[in-house]
From Swiss-Prot:
Its main location: secreted. It is an enzyme of class 3 (hydrolase). This is GDSL esterase/lipase EXL2. The active site is at S54 (nucleophile), D358, H361. It is found in: Secreted. Its EC number is 3.1.1.-. The gene is EXL2. It comes from Arabidopsis thaliana. Residues 1-35 form the signal peptide.
Length: 379
């Protein structure tokens, strides 16, 4: 039986006291995050360590033949250094690459499972993120990109968040062998940990699988997501991380593929998808605030990317964009991962005019703008 059933079309207009309590917690988080993210005086950020899904995957899925959620082939990477497809779901760099550059750490963050990874890369940070991952375990076990009532194409997920933590444990042991236990602890303590996940849970698992909707309503499913995100952040804290940023989910109802599949004849942003995302983000921010207070550590924070991306989508010309409802690859309506390839899909020549690279992921230019917004707000 479904629990706590709600009308998701009107989630933003709730007037019940529990909702508003959570809402004000979000406001509190937003007004205090600037001070929370900064390092203590005279300390630098030695590394950025990333967990999550395809938004920040840099190639961890490249050699996993059981998943279609990989993109280590052209035209992916067409604007990356040397035009090489690295496994990033983008035409070039992703947001965490730009953030690493702005911190002066390195130009990009490599995938931990990259066979060409150099030992020195471990000292300055890697990404464990994997396309298809989610906070709900079965999101990774069976994630899908294409749905019209019934699944058209099943994409078995890559590396679950629990397994990403196992890889992190392996990473820590390698670090200890390189620089010793004490320096490893210091690097982990001062490094910036970023967790970016949740999009697949909402679009693919909840709204893509009728069986999940029979088991959960939006309220209970987003609570499950937010609780699992809190647990993940707490695990990182137990590993010694002291600068943890957990990013909210973006407005997934406005990505091209979801407009195509659920946006009606005019391909509008899907309101119920965005409402569910906003509800999840509110709960996530509240959970992280609660965790911070429980641990007595104010360096676990919520980072908003919903408004950052939505602002670009709603006012594209301000940022030099012309196309917001289609991706640059192929028709721009549905192509992502396997469907975006040199044999079946052409690529737009004017990529800087597109907000989205494929039907699910932003272009390098969009990521650059979002990284700038991040620095203006949180650093």
């Amino acid at each position: 039986m479904k629990r706590n059933s709600i009308n998701i079309h009107h989630v933003t207009s709730f007037s019940s006291s529990p909702f508003w309590c959570v809402f004000f917690l979000v406001l509190l988080c937003k007004t205090s995050t600037n001070a929370l993210v900064k390092q203590p005086p005279n300390e630098t950020t030695p590394a950025i360590i990333v967990f999550g899904d395809s938004i920040v995957d840099a190639g961890n899925n490249d050699d996993i033949m059981t998943t279609l959620a990989r993109c280590n082939y052209p035209p992916y990477g067409i604007d990356f250094d040397g035009g090489i497809p690295t496994g990033r779901f983008c035409n070039g760099k992703v947001a965490t690459d730009f953030i690493a550059g702005k911190f002066g750490i390195k130009p990009s963050i490599p995938a931990y499972r990259n066979p060409n990874l150099k030992p020195e890369d471990l000292l300055t940070g890697v990404t464990f993120a994997s396309g298809g991952a989610g906070y709900v375990p079965f999101t990774t076990q069976l994630s899908t990109y294409l749905f019209i009532y019934k699944p058209l194409l099943f994409l078995k997920g890559g590396i679950a968040l629990s397994q990403q933590l196992k890889l992190f444990e392996e990473y820590v042991e390698k670090m200890k062998k390189m620089v010793g236990e004490e320096r490893t602890k210091l690097i982990i303590k001062n490094s910036l940990f970023m967790v970016i996940c949740g999009s697949n849970d909402i679009t693919n698992t909840y709204f893509g699988l009728p069986s999940v909707q029979q088991q959960y309503d939006v309220a209970s499913f987003t609570t499950l997501m937010a609780d699992n995100a809190r647990s993940f952040a707490q695990k990182l804290h137990e590993y010694g991380a002291r600068r943890i940023q957990v990013f909210g989910a973006p407005p997934v109802g406005c990505v091209p593929s979801q407009r195509t599949l659920a946006g009606g004849p005019t391909r509008n942003c899907v309101v119920r998808f965005n409402d569910a995302t906003k509800l999840y983000n509110v709960k996530l921010a509240a959970n992280l605030g609660s965790l911070s207070r429980t641990l007595g550590d104010k360096t676990i924070i919520y980072v908003d990317i919903y408004d950052s991306l939505l602002d670009i989508i709603l006012d594209p010309r301000q940022y030099g964009f012309k196309v917001v409802d289609k991706g640059c690859c192929g028709t721009g309506l549905i192509e992502v991962a396997l469907l975006c390839n040199n044999f079946a899909a052409d690529v737009c020549p004017n990529r800087d005019e597109y907000v989205f690279w494929d039907s699910f992921h932003p272009t390098e230019k969009t990521y650059r703008i979002m990284a700038t917004k991040y620095f203006e707000r949180y650093v």
